[in-house]
Amino acid sequence: MPFLKSLRLDGILSFPPGSEPIPLTGLNVLIGPNGSGKSNLIEGIELLHALPTGFASAIREGGGAREWLWKGENTARVGTIETCVEYLSLFKVVGRSSTETLGLIHHPPIFRYRLAFSALGQRVEITDEVIEDETKNGDLDPDSSSYYRFKKGNPIVHARSVNGLTNTDRREKRVLDPTALKQDESILAQLKDSFVYPELTGIGQKFEQMRGFREWSFGRNGQLRQPQPADLPSEALLPDMRNLGLILNQLEHSSAWAEFNTYLSRFLPRFQRFSTLIVGGTVQFFLHEAGMKMPIPATRLSDGTIRFMAILAQLLSPTPPPLICMEEPELGLHPDAIALLASLL
């Protein structure tokens, strides 16, 4: 089941006011001419990714709030991003069922998340934010079907009640102090407690775990070719891929390693094996080819080989992100290599 079920951008970038939601499946391929809005859709996904950590920073780095708003006829004053997310994918706990662990047994299968923002001078201001049951749209009492609602600056959250040291499945309606909340940051960045606010926390964690790869830099002096610090994250490939060595080292010690080598042998006829080396607090990776006495370091591998390995490592990860977004992954690859990756996608 895909984590994101749909995405709607309204009054944002090239998406005019009144834009319809875009349904999403397990695999989504965007094809269109230059300027058709493919990159803008990816920008919207990156906004979701930034919500739990730094929405204001993401808006600022994109040129400021006014640059994000629709600039066509009848210029938009408010931009809205809305998505529906699959409930069960939020709460996966090893060894126990998600509903048993969190005490959540009466949820519908889909949540709806919506955030609206406008420009306040040079700053961004959040004007609306809602987390609710997807099936409860239009309820006579919208508060009863929501887990958080901005309510025109009078925010309300439904928190799980606590009986002693035990969490229950009952909800308590809490009115938050608006002066204690930052007006340019999402509630996902300000309320984080998996037991008291499981829906907010679960959605925020999944948004943060999403990965987007847009700037492919495989030049001779690229960071991913150099010895990489061993203390970088090893759970998922970073957007700039500077932890590729650590990801490959993790993959080497997983059940997916044999499949990784199988794909590399189909990609490189001379491929013999792949290895990583940890020394001096850094990680390096090497390619061994038949007929060669010494392995080939990352600094000498071709751009296409590095690109194929990076994509392969991400697609074979034992703990994949809830969403992987790749912009033009086919660049620099032989058509035969694209066919190999297509089967994994």
List the model feature ranges, each with a label.
Residues L4, T80-C84, I110-R112, E125-T127, ...:
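Broad gene-expression machinery/nucleic-acid interaction feature
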Residues D10, E86-K92, S118, E132-E134, ...:
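A generic structural motif
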Residues E43-R123:
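Conserved P-loop NTP-binding catalytic core
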